[in-house]
């Protein structure tokens, strides 16, 4: 029988938002009490008027004024789009894989070490890995250039990111226990 807990990799979606929040805190982009106004539609800074310059919450509904705590409670995609956009904008200072490094610290890119057969590693692709995948497998990975949109998607747990249910459980256990990843 298939053990989906360790053999299957899924996009974590909004359950990834605490990882993005920590990256934003560490980068100095946000403080817990900083408030932003979430009107439901996020416009990528300096992007223009293209359709790819806009990201929206579910149903394009805004959550109003949000800080770190309420952004998690209300699951404001807008708040995390802003963090992702600014992590990418600050890539010269932070590196172009700052969010992925934070995901790695939570154990998302390695197996957990549990003694179960067929455990898979999750992934949080970096710009360099996406370029390499494009070079090696151009039909499967036709886009080799990382953009702001890749980081924005990853900031809400979508896109170039996959985790096993056990990895996600371990990450949340580390949050709950003060930071120890087992």
Regions found by a protein language model. Name each.
Residues 1-14, 19-182:
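Beta-lactam-recognizing serine transpeptidase/beta-lactamase-like catalytic domain environment
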């Amino acid at each position: 029988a298939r053990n989906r807990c360790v053999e299957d990799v899924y996009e974590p979606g909004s359950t990834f938002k605490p990882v993005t929040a920590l990256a934003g805190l560490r980068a100095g982009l946000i403080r817990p009490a900083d408030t932003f106004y979430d009107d439901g539609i996020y416009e990528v800074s300096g992007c223009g008027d293209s359709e790819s310059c806009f990201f929206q919450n579910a149903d394009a509904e805004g959550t109003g004024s949000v800080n770190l705590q309420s952004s998690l409670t209300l699951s404001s995609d807008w708040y995390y789009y802003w963090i992702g956009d600014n992590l990418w904008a600050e890539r010269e200072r932070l590196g172009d894989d700052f969010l992925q490094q934070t995901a790695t610290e939570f154990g998302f890119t390695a197996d957990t070490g549990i003694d179960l057969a067929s455990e898979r590693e999750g992934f949080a692709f970096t710009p360099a890995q996406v370029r390499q995948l494009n070079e090696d497998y151009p039909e499967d990975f036709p886009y080799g250039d990382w953009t702001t949109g890749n980081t924005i998607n990853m900031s809400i747990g979508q896109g170039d990111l996959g985790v096993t249910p056990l990895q996600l459980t371990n990450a949340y256990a580390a949050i709950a226990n003060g930071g120890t990843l087992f």
